[in-house]
UniProtKB/Swiss-Prot annotation:
Phosphotyrosine modification, residue list: Y139
Active site: D368 (proton acceptor)
Gene Ontology terms: biological process: adherens junction assembly; bicellular tight junction assembly; dendritic spine development; execution phase of apoptosis; intracellular signal transduction; negative regulation of apoptotic process; negative regulation of stress fiber assembly; positive regulation of apoptotic process
Organism for this UniProt entry: Oryctolagus cuniculus
Protein name per Swiss-Prot or TrEMBL: Serine/threonine-protein kinase PAK 2
Region (Linker): 88-248
Domain of life: Eukaryota
Residue ranges of the region described as Disordered: 1-81, 169-188, 204-228
Modified residues (Phosphothreonine): T60, T134, T143, T159, T169, T402
EC number assigned by the record: 2.7.11.1
Modification Phosphoserine, positions: S2, S20, S55, S58, S64, S141, S152, S197
SUPFAM superfamilies: Protein kinase-like (PK-like) (SSF56112)
Length: 524
């Protein structure tokens, strides 16, 4: 199959997904899903200013200093925070001491009084999730403006972080990547988010164990570990290649413009290879140290099922990141515009599990597995991308506790803020498999807060039409979506699951990719 998508013997067109199962909640809640009946919604309306949500935390997220010549390790939490104490009266079924903004969110969340009484702690967990000072957007996914979409073949690399108080939506960011022709992005509440760790802090020295004094020591820690801009630039100079990318790559074609950077396709002069190049203005990056983290991780993670990092250059304050370009677009385009059969789903799951087995063997958790972060080659290759959220686990810290990822794909242990490990990626893969069946993840038609509550309390989601799936596929889903982490399958174990033996050749994905592109063209 050539990249131009021409087939000599054209097979019957694959089934196209005629309509989405998403329905608007119809409420006035600004956090409610606002979907049309089309598979992909129209361009989001201009965001109105939101009231700032009162934070239960006293500090801000800290950067961590990276070690020379090593993949950066995410340090154990050192922010000892003083929190607001919220109580729950079991008799009246009311919360006490709740900040006014939280109360407003709860009123419009569609979480019923019965649900609140049944599990008040889960309610508080999801409210904390929306705290304005804990929600952070991914730093390295590129931000396309409304008029310039990026082809999904260009790996995500964020060049803007909004400092605006946010729930799941942000004023300027969009880590979903559109394939030409430009299509409307998915709903804002399907974007990736990051919240700070809430793991119990490392015991403080005697005499400093009180939470308030811990907060003071947190400030000292931040001063010690925060990298200055000059230190960051110096570190970048040690990891990038020397030279001018404008001379090593030619035929630059602008395919997108973000608030602080530009994305191009270009051709490697020496190899004749088409690549994606991100030109990032570092002066507009508030979290430059996270760029170092992702570049170092990407440089070290070489695998056939991971989008390949090729090179990076620093010219003044401009960072050029060269990545593999996949012309097929993102899996999101396929799942929202076409209907996949089980054998095609098995093929995608197998490729993703191969990537996850490699990552987990290298003590790396991706933490944001979803169809948007799976890119396809025109010949059907399947590759994971977007390592802005990845975390390294170490012998000293084998579990993470930061709430990271995208709400609808999050594992219950992440939503409930428990310590977690690599199997959060397996849960997200299971949700992505449902996405491939139904065109969207479970609970997407719910208010985001209630969706998080349902994930935390219900656990394994119900399928819309389970009887239509084969027993072997249902068993695979059950192994991925097992609430008990110990019983949930690992990537290595699931690669041996009988369902994957049903997989069609990867070339079977090519007609779906082409059909998705045609459908998007007609939706313009």
């Amino acid at each position: 199959m050539s990249d131009n998508g021409e087939l000599e013997d054209k097979p019957p067109a694959p089934p196209v997904r005629m309509s989405s199962t998403i329905f608007s909640t119809g409420g006035k809640d600004p956090l409610s899903a606002n979907h049309s009946l089309k598979p992909l919604p129209s361009v989001p309306e201009e965001k109105k200013p939101r009231n700032k949500i009162i934070s239960i935390f006293s500090g801000t997220e800290k950067g961590s200093k990276k070690k020379e010549k090593e993949r950066p390790e995410i340090s154990p939490p050192s922010d000892f925070e003083h929190t607001i104490h919220v109580g729950f009266d079991a008799v009246t079924g009311e919360f006490t001491g709740m900040p006014e903004q939280w109360a407003r969110l709860l009123q419009t969340s569609n979480i019923t009084k019965l649900e609140q009484k049944k599990n008040p702690q889960a309610v508080l967990d999801v409210l904390k999730f929306y705290d304005s000072n804990t929600v952070k957007q991914k730093y390295l996914s590129f931000t396309p403006p409304e008029k310039d979409g990026f082809p999904s073949g260009a790996p995500a690399l964020n060049t803007k972080v909004s400092e605006t108080s946010a729930v799941v939506t942000e004023e300027d960011d969009d880590d979903e990547e559109a394939a030409p022709p430009v299509i409307a992005p998915r709903p804002d509440h399907t974007k990736s988010i990051y919240t700070r760790s809430v793991i119990d802090p490392i015991p403080a020295p005697v005499g400093d164990s009180h939470v308030d004094s811990g907060a003071k020591s947190s400030d000292k820690q931040k001063k010690k570990t925060k990298m200055t801009d000059e230190e960051i630039m110096e570190k970048l100079r040690t990891i990038v290649s020397i030279g001018d990318p404008k001379k090593k790559y030619t035929r630059y074609e602008k395919i997108g413009q973000g608030a602080s950077g530009t994305v191009f396709t270009a051709t490697d002069v020496a190899l004749g290879q088409e690549v994606a190049i991100k030109q990032i203005n570092l002066q507009k990056q508030p979290k430059k140290e996270l760029i170092i983290n992702e570049i170092l991780v990407m440089k070290e993670l070489k695998n056939p099922n991971i989008v390949n990092f090729l090179d990076s250059y620093l010219v003044g304050d401009e960072l050029f990141v060269v990545m593999e370009y996949l012309a097929g677009g993102s899996l999101t385009d396929v799942v929202t515009e076409t209907c996949m059969d089980e054998a095609q789903i098995a093929a995608v799951c197998r490729e993703c599990l191969q990537a996850l087995e490699f990552l987990h063997a290298n003590q790396v958790i991706h933490r944001d597995i979803k169809s948007d972060n799976v890119l396809l080659g025109m010949e059907g290759s399947v590759k994971l991308t977007d390592f802005g959220f990845c975390a390294q686990i170490t012998p000293e810290q084998s579990k993470r506790s930061t709430m990271v990822g995208t709400p609808y794909w999050m594992a219950p242990e992440v939503v409930t803020r428990k310590a977690y490990g690599p199997k959060v990626d397996i849960w997200s893969l299971g949700i992505m498999a449902i996405e491939m069946v139904e065109g969207e993840p479970p609970y997407l038609n719910e208010n985001p807060l209630r969706a998080l509550y349902l994930i935390a309390t219900n656990g394994t989601p119900e399928l819309q039409n389970p009887e239509k799936l084969s027993p072997i596929f249902r068993d695979f889903l059950n192994r991925c979506l097992e609430m008990d982490v110990e019983k949930r399958g690992s990537a290595k174990e699931l690669l041996q699951h009988p369902f994957l033996k049903l997989a069609k050749p990867l070339s079977s994905l090519t007609p779906l990719i082409m059909a998705a592109k045609e459908a998007m063209k007609s939706n313009r």
